[in-house]
């Protein structure tokens, strides 16, 4: 029957672009956002896959470091404070997210060296005359 087109075969199940790429982040949704956002007139097929992979990697990195910060503080739940500590203590993430403010993140503990008590030079039992 000519002119019918390809059509979907009855037995085939739809496979998402995320699962094809081995990603958890939604490639289709990111593609839709890229098109809707008018970032460019046309969006290549690989662009949303690449962007989803980058976002997934950065998210996994931040969550791993924040989980370590939560464990260091003997907590089971990651809160914004742990995310703040994770980002600010990591050199590369700190540079990437330097201008970002995290709500309820607090500040890094830091005491200026001038304000710290001076260490005495003499050892035990020695007194200056």
Swiss-Prot record:
Q: List the disulfide bonds.
A: none
Q: Which GO terms describe its molecular function?
A: DNA binding; protein heterodimerization activity; structural constituent of chromatin
Subcellular localization is given as:
Nucleus; Chromosome
Q: Name one GO cellular component term.
A: nucleus
Where is it chiefly localized?
Answer: nucleus
The cross-references to SMART domains, in alphabetical order and at most eight, read: H2A (SM00414)
Q: Which Pfam families match?
A: Histone, Histone_H2A_C
Residues making up the signal peptide according to the UniProt record? none
Which InterPro entries has this protein been placed in? Histone-fold, Histone_H2A, Histone_H2A/H2B/H3, Histone_H2A_C, Histone_H2A_CS
The entry's keywords: Chromosome, DNA-binding, Nucleosome core, Nucleus
Its annotated function is as follows: Core component of nucleosome. Nucleosomes wrap and compact DNA into chromatin, limiting DNA accessibility to the cellular machineries which require DNA as a template. Histones thereby play a central role in transcription regulation, DNA repair, DNA replication and chromosomal stability. DNA accessibility is regulated via a complex set of post-translational modifications of histones, also called histone code, and nucleosome remodeling.
Entry's family note: Belongs to the histone H2A family.
Q: How does it assemble?
A: The nucleosome is a histone octamer containing two molecules each of H2A, H2B, H3 and H4 assembled in one H3-H4 heterotetramer and two H2A-H2B heterodimers. The octamer wraps approximately 147 bp of DNA.
Q: What's this protein's name?
A: Histone H2A-IV
């Amino acid at each position: 029957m000519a002119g019918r087109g390809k059509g979907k075969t009855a037995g085939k199940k739809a496979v998402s672009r995320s699962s094809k790429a081995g990603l958890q982040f939604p490639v289709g949704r990111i593609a839709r956002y890229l098109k809707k956002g008018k970032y460019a007139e046309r969006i290549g097929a690989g662009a949303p896959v690449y962007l989803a992979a980058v976002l997934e990697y950065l998210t996994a990195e931040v969550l791993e470091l924040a989980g370590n910060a939560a464990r260091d503080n003997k907590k089971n739940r990651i809160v914004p404070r742990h995310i703040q500590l994770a980002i600010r203590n990591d050199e590369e993430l700190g540079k990437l997210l330097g201008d970002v403010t995290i709500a309820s993140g607090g500040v890094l503990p830091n005491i200026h060296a001038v304000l710290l008590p001076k260490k005495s030079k003499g050892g035990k039992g020695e007194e200056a005359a």
